[in-house]
């Protein structure tokens, strides 16, 4: 009954973006995610964030979202891959998740963003953004949430993955202070 109520509310709302994130407390799982994705407002930008640092979950359950924002640990768990270096690891998840944008969070090493390549030879299918957190990190809790929120808003406003990645990284860095 709760799932029906929640998906009905979601389908009746008007939103430019919908972020699916519940810190893996049970709302989003393999059985419910398809219902939530189907209920998202037409043309809304959908974002999946599994938040499984302390619980088991699989970011691939959000396959089909427009953007995913996992950390390295979540990607390695989803793919069962503890050995690959970051670029091939992210490329594999990007392909399997069928998302438009994958922002792979790397903690103090920054972030690598994967996107569809264009025919323009100057546009890569991936790029990295260094961490903008200062050396005096006081509280990293919430940095991923700040990145998620600001990157989503910027992507919806600009349609530019590079700008969204940079603004999200700035927000994450500020959250650490």
Residue ranges of predicted features:
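Conserved phosphate-binding/catalytic region of the ribokinase-like
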Residues: 5-9, 13-17, 21, 31-64, ...
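Conserved short loop/turn motifs at secondary-structure junctions
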Residues: 22-26
